[in-house]
């Protein structure tokens, strides 16, 4: 059951614009920066960030797509023959010596980010890995912190954060739901 909308379309747009500026400022430009979105919604957020960065800097930043299914320690979705459902990684550039900015919709326990870092390290040796998330809801199980956060939304363990994006859900909003 939905309790409250915490970010609407305009608030999401503002948060992503701010994150884009923070990425540029922290990295003193975008040279050697690449964005890698974590499937599924992180990919669309990474593409939106890339558009904003290009508008601000006048240069394109490469964007990749990361499927972390095989790196997770809590596989849940399996195919009929009990194998993990893999959607595919598409990182069409070398990450070696790059500043990799992982992009995801929600930071919760940190397990997704840990799996994403493992997947990135299998692609090469980045100079640095940074993390950008639309929502940080707390409840970390691993010592992981986002470098760029759209909004901190403290939640209870009985609540869910639901991120809906136009590309997947036909609307942009973040809401809190009761489990």
Curated annotation (Swiss-Prot):
Please state the Enzyme Commission number of this protein.
2.4.2.9
Q: Where is this motif: PRPP-binding?
A: 100-112
Q: Which reaction does it catalyse?
A: UMP + diphosphate = 5-phospho-alpha-D-ribose 1-diphosphate + uracil
| Signal peptide range in chain numbering | none
Q: Which GO terms describe its molecular function?
A: RNA binding; uracil phosphoribosyltransferase activity
The record, for InterPro entries, names: PRibTrfase_dom, PRTase-like, PyrR, PyrR_bifunctional
Tell me any Pfam family this protein matches.
Pribosyltran
**One annotated GO biological process:** DNA-templated transcription termination
Per UniProt, which keywords does this protein have? Glycosyltransferase, RNA-binding, Transcription, Transcription regulation, Transcription termination, Transferase
How it assembles, according to the record, is: Homodimer and homohexamer; in equilibrium.
Q: What is the name of the protein in this document? A: Bifunctional protein PyrR
């Amino acid at each position: 059951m939905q309790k409250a909308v915490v970010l609407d379309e305009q608030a999401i747009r503002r948060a992503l614009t701010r994150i884009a500026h923070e990425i540029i400022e922290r990295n003193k430009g975008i040279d050697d920066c690449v964005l890698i979105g974590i499937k599924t919604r992180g990919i669309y957020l990474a593409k939106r960030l890339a558009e904003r960065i290009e508008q601000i800097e006048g240069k394109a930043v490469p964007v990749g797509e990361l499927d972390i299914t095989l790196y997770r320690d809590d596989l849940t979705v399996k195919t009929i023959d009990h194998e993990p459902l893999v959607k595919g990684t598409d990182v069409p550039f070398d990450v070696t010596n790059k500043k990799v900015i992982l992009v995801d919709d929600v930071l919760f326990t940190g397990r997704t980010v840990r799996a994403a870092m493992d997947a990135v390290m299998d692609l090469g040796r980045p100079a640095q890995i940074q993390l950008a998330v639309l929502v940080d809801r707390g409840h970390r199980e691993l010592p992981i912190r986002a470098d760029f956060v759209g909004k901190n939304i403290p939640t209870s363990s009985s609540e869910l954060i639901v991120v809906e994006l136009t590309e997947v859900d036909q609307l942009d909003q973040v809401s809190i739901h009761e489990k």
